[in-house]
Amino acid sequence: MGHNWECANFMTLTSEVDGSSRDFVIVGAEGADRSHPNSIFTEYPQPVTKFPREERSLQWMCGRLRADHGMARPAPAMDYVCGSKFDHALMYGVNSFHDPQSGKQIAYGWITEEDLPQPLIDRQNWSGLISIPRDLSLVVVKNVVGALNSKLEDITSLELELESGGTYKARTLGISPSHKLEALRGGARHVKVSKPHALSLASRIGLDVQTCRFELFAAFQVSDHCRRIGFSIYHTQDLNPEFATSIYLETESETLMIDRPDSSHVDPDILTFSERAPFTLLNIMQPDGSIQREQLQVRAFFDESVLEVFANDRCTFATRIYPATKRVWGIRFWADDDSGHSELLGSKAWDGLRADIRVQ
């Protein structure tokens, strides 16, 4: 959890599913103990680079606030229940506030420019930017019986409550794009895939997205035989995968990945290693007693060199990519699944988002 905390946020969130409430703290954690077995820098080590990223991260913790009477005067204390990273890439310094109009807790953060060498930062005369607003919530999933591979009790981002039928109620922090961002869609070109399609590595199912300013939503059904599933954003006309951005789930390792395009043509010192985060899909018991895996739902916002990704409203990335061109040559959906049972259930995109309007 780092050697120093800064930009701390405290909040109480209430679920719309069952009315339960939990206390949360979001902190910027500076420094890291690389020798600790649970260090994020040990589990997901960075490649050797000329200028590695700062050893800092955004963390959230869920617990129960109480009064500690073990001191001369009662002091507030929190019993830790669960936690994870608030963002798994470059976001830092988050602050949040309660929006009286929507009743939601809204968070903003700083997306840094650590992956650019200093000469390029100096040339552009600015560094970093503010993220899109994120709605925070207490997510509650009922009737959970398992995950892709991990035991439920080993998933440290979940609070588990045993239900009467032997299933579990799982709670975690929900992080989703603010609904107010829908105002940016005005005037954008709407493209979609309406029907389910079986996916393979050779699939040609895609969306005709052309600009570097778009919002994307995609829903997938992931089979037991699937090894990887996701989509690729092409930045060159020849659809060269080396210069594409690929966002996908590795099911065996339960890891969500973002492979960023090669930017050595711009500057060999730009960092383009893959972003990764622990992520799994939950298995849920249905009223008829059958077990159904939840969908993989991905939302992505791309704006020139900024990519923000949200998976199932509980795993997020805010990263930077520096593509070869200032446009996109489409998005293709695919799966590494020989059975043909993994599907794209549907997708839609708003291409050419406007940035010159005021979001109310």
Across the structure, where does each feature detected by a protein language model lie?
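Gly/Pro-rich turn-and-neighbor structural signature
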Residues: 1-101
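Beta-rich accessory regions
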Residues: 31, 59-360
